[in-house]
Amino acid sequence: MNDTYQFDAAGALLSTQLPFPRRQGKVRDVYDLGDRLLIVSSDRISAFDYILPTGIPDKGRLLTAMSRFWFEQMDAGRIGQNVGSAGGDGSSNPRSISHHLISTDVPEDVAAVVDPKPLEGRVMVTRKASVVPFECVVRGYLEGSGWKEYQATGEVCGVSLPAGLKQCDQLSEAIFTPATKAEEGHDENVSYEVMSQSLGEEQSSQLRRMSLAIYQDASKIAAERGLLIADTKFEFGVVDGELMLIDEVLTPDSSRFWAADEYEPGHSQRSFDKQFVREYLQESDWDRNSPPPPLPESIAHQTADRYREGYERLVGKAFA
């Protein structure tokens, strides 16, 4: 197992080495199983586009469980109905939004060649997709890089906003603010026009419509459970000519979750995501131009507790 799985001293899974072609992302190890992909969510954590040397125990399992929850909401017809989908040529028709998930069980062909136990609860078996090279960011509240850009320009990714907004204010309507994708290095916020010039207006419009619809439907589900989704990023790909939701969805790594009963604009909010790590690093002496420092054990465990609390509030049951 030592060659297959790498853990840190706290038991967080930092890396996997399965006997299949692998592509390693910031958090996930993606394996090519021939006709499908195996996505393994490690316990790595990234911040400011750097991978930290410290893992967050059980983070990968929590991410997978939350993605599974949201994909199940889509399957149940609570998210993305009658929005439309687009083919690779940008053609559209009214239909439900599809996703790439096949299963969250460890495949038999994988379990036959490695110890499957460390993988249990942290894998997604998915269809292969041609990935759209933009992250589809939706912001319902003004925080993070959006808040910083607004302070400087009064806009976020080319979207003009009213004057006088405070940090974490709710926007009158959610806005679509794409970003370029980067496996390594820094993602870059761009305007919708930049995306449209790259992908074409038809597909860009469809991505915006689908992203806003998923965010709005998911926000209603979260609100029923006392949670606010401040912002999130989606990824899409084309499978057999159909544009569909891929990768993780509405997890603490891709989204900011706040408690509705604690919400108070004008300052940063207590969150159930990795903002806790971001704030710790911002207050440290790290210059963001060099490899980040290890997290103290207390910060890693408090972050794990935040992830777990967010999951349990959302799903309504204890994380096992």
UniProtKB/Swiss-Prot annotation:
Gene3D superfamilies linked to this entry: ATP-grasp fold, B domain, Phosphorylase Kinase, domain 1
GO biological process: 'de novo' IMP biosynthetic process
Pathway participation: Purine metabolism; IMP biosynthesis via de novo pathway; 5-amino-1-(5-phospho-D-ribosyl)imidazole-4-carboxamide from 5-amino-1-(5-phospho-D-ribosyl)imidazole-4-carboxylate: step 1/2
Pfam families xref list: SAICAR_synt
PROSITE patterns to which the protein is assigned, alphabetical: SAICAR_SYNTHETASE_1 (PS01057), SAICAR_SYNTHETASE_2 (PS01058)
Residue numbers spanned by region Disordered: 283-303
HAMAP family membership: SAICAR_synth
Record family assignment: Belongs to the SAICAR synthetase family.
Protein name: Phosphoribosylaminoimidazole-succinocarboxamide synthase
Species this chain originates from: Rhodopirellula baltica (strain DSM 10527 / NCIMB 13988 / SH1)
Taxonomy of the source species: Bacteria, Pseudomonadati, Planctomycetota, Planctomycetia, Pirellulales
